[in-house]
């Protein structure tokens, strides 16, 4: 485990709080730990954290880990391997971890665990935690790809993990924007729509397939971008994750133009 001094140095350089950097550091080691565990072959890393840890190391900071479970594995087996991983990281890297049974959420389509930790800032165990979410029975449109995990910290190790493609992350974000009011989804979608690495001709059909599997109406995308809750939560939800947060109005204007350009605002269910 790195020192509190290194956390503070990174926080100063990144213009973020020490707590944000500490959580990012802990998330990184949890990801590396799972990438070194028997669970690796059953995981597809996804979401905003995958954008930062797999594709774009300078991207916004995140607060949780999101995976889709592939293949056949029981939830109890997942929990057992996560617990073993936490014990191994505690012994090898000096963390303290706790996975309270009362903070394990089981649903038909997901398994969520909250992991309390003591990291370099040495806060009391139970005062800080990270969420690790496992989605079950998810339909993937694109193949899972093995990618190296980015870590900019001094004690990094080299590991790969199965991850969503950028195209898969984009189609999930399109559905997420329709299904919930969460500013980070809009921020991520705006970012992804501007990336030349993405094979955009594949996206309309992939979006339609993903939306059908999630029982989401793709025709509601434009309506979803106009929800008043976005403006109320834009700054409070994102200011601690983004160095220079753009104005929501600018983001929405550019995003709608790009969505229209790629034929994503005219899709019908």
Question: Which role does the model predict for each range below?
Answer:
Residues 45-49:
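Glycine-rich beta-strand-to-loop/alpha-helix junction loops that act as flexible
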